[in-house]
């Protein structure tokens, strides 16, 4: 998809990108935006919000968006995800439930229940049936659900509350409180294949799997991101780096890395943070590909579309300063950034 007639190359040649062509999504959520997810089959964007609603938009070639559907939970919605065939949207909520919305029928139904908030939802390929929904909760469990059944087909006990989760087959990675990282191979979905401690010293805020399912990136509240390979023989390629910081003399303002997203074609990735900026990175050449100016508010979540030529990000309060700092004057926007190839393509390592 060519978003509103964009060129295949950027008009900006320096290290700072341009936001002038970014387009705002019409009729955004009315409270903090918690998650964004594009359909793998069409230009549909799902957004979850603290206003207890899930909204689904159609993004047109002009860059304009049209609201296509809306459904509600009984509490703030924290996570959204699409089924592989693009016919269903799953959502997890503070109301301790997960729901699935059918795009074709326009109906939603509760498909999962926990003893505490459902922090993350992901459709997975496991256990010989499809689709299976994995739900990670603050009740310290991961559950798998066959959408045709009212009880989970399997439950995995976790060391702590789920803070972030992502899946690229066969890898399912769950980050919990106390900096635990649980790695699951979906060929054995009820077993924790590897339990590791985050290499970052502070609380995990975001997580995303590599596009080949052989590793993951994690971000912390302390302005750091880490790249982790699953195979021990590639451990020498693991590293972490600083990001989303404002250096002033000998001190620095440090911001949370709220969102990480991998480009579906190139495997390069984005980070977005509480400082109101996002950047594109190449993990293999250890380079920042492009940074972008402040967008006018904290970025709470972000994602690429299926072809990688649209980067969606939400300008919204991220709750990093607690309830008392939230107010009605803060923006709630979803922006669509056209992604020229030269801003996101991998680069050779320096010195080669």
Curated annotation (Swiss-Prot):
One of its GO terms (molecular function) is RNA binding. Keywords: Nucleus, Repeat, Transport, WD repeat. One of its GO terms (biological process) is mRNA export from nucleus. The keyword Nucleus applies. Gene3D superfamilies: YVTN repeat-like/Quinoprotein amine dehydrogenase. One of its GO terms (cellular component) is nuclear pore. Signal peptide: none annotated. The keyword ATP-binding does not apply. WD repeats lie at residues 28-58, 72-102, 113-146, 192-229, 252-282. It is found in: Nucleus. InterPro entries: G-protein_beta_WD-40_rep, WD40/YVTN_repeat-like_dom_sf, WD40_repeat_dom_sf, WD40_rpt. It comes from the Eukaryota. Pfam families: WD40 (PF00400). Required for mitotic cell growth as well as for spore germination. Functions in cell cycle progression through trafficking of proteins required for mitosis. Has a role in the mRNA export process. Interacts with rpn15/dss1 and uap56. Belongs to the WD repeat rae1 family. This is Poly(A)+ RNA export protein. It comes from Schizosaccharomyces pombe (strain 972 / ATCC 24843). The gene is rae1.
